């Protein structure tokens, strides 16, 4: 639920979250959709300005209905930010918290090319959520990107997939950058999987469709490392 939202869609979410009479209607539809499509649960991916008044109440109410139907609830949160409007009760309601340890730079920072998702970024995210916020590692998963950013232009930064880099040259599978194109290759993914295996419950991927569907697959790299 959520993710990248247009301004009009964002307003709809804000209105639902703030309205205690409308929230139950939305929640019932989410639960029914999950059941109709044989889903395991819901990931609440409302980010930044979309975390508004009513968010915590929504999460707590949604959790109650999902749990009653044996469905799980997770959230995707920035690597080193806890939104001030999220209460401790709401935070504890999630079965897992997915740490989005990527997008440390991107199109919004075109003049400063660099890695958007390094091992150090991942380590910082784990430290923040475990040691500063105090979430048990058993409830945390580490987000890894199957995409990167192209900083070859000083004015326009575009994203690209790991799969496209491997298609260009299989040697790119074991690199983290080609010129000013930055991404995660297999060695860095292995290091991140090791970090996750030692300190938390698993790996979250954004997103599977960006992988290389060959012997150089990052998903296969994750499976082999685990």
Positions of PLM-derived features:
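Short, acidic/polar
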Residues: 18-36, 79-90, 183-197
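Soluble non-cytosolic domains of exported or imported proteins
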Residues: 17-25, 49-57, 116-123, 183-190, ...
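Active-site and adjacent substrate-binding regions of carbohydrate-active enzymes
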Residues: 35, 45-73, 77, 188-226
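Substrate-binding cleft of extracellular glycoside hydrolase catalytic domains
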Residues: 1-42, 46-49
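Substrate-binding surface in catalytic domains of secreted glycosidases
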Residues: 28, 48-170
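Glycan-binding loop/region signatures in secreted carbohydrate-active enzymes
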Residues: 137-199, 220-226
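Receiver (REC) domain switch/active-site residues of two-component response regulators
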Residues: 40, 95, 201
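Acidic glycine-/aspartate-rich tracts in secreted/extracellular proteins
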Residues: 3-6, 145-149, 209-211
């Amino acid at each position: 639920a959520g993710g990248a939202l247009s301004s009009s869609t964002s307003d709809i979410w804000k209105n639902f979250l703030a309205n205690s009479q409308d929230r139950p209607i939305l929640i019932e539809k989410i639960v029914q959709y999950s059941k109709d499509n044989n889903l395991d649960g819901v990931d609440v991916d409302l980010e930044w300005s979309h975390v508004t008044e009513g968010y915590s109440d929504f999460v707590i109410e949604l959790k109650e209905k999902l749990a009653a139907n044996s469905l799980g609830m997770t959230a995707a949160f920035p690597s080193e930010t806890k939104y001030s409007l999220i209460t401790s009760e709401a935070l504890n309601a999630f079965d897992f918290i997915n740490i989005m340890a990527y997008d440390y730079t991107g199109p919004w920072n075109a003049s400063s090319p660099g890695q958007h998702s390094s091992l150090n970024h991942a380590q910082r995210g784990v430290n923040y959520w475990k040691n500063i916020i105090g979430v048990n590692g058993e409830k945390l998963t580490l987000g890894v990107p199957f995409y990167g950013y192209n900083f070859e232009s000083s004015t326009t930064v575009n994203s690209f997939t790991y799969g496209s880099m491997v298609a260009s040259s299989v040697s790119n599978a074991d690199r983290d950058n080609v010129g000013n194109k930055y991404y995660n290759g297999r060695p860095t993914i292995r290091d991140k999987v090791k970090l996750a295996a030692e300190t938390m419950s698993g790996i979250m991927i954004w997103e599977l469709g960006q992988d290389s569907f060959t012997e150089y697959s990052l998903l296969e790299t994750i499976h082999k490392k685990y």
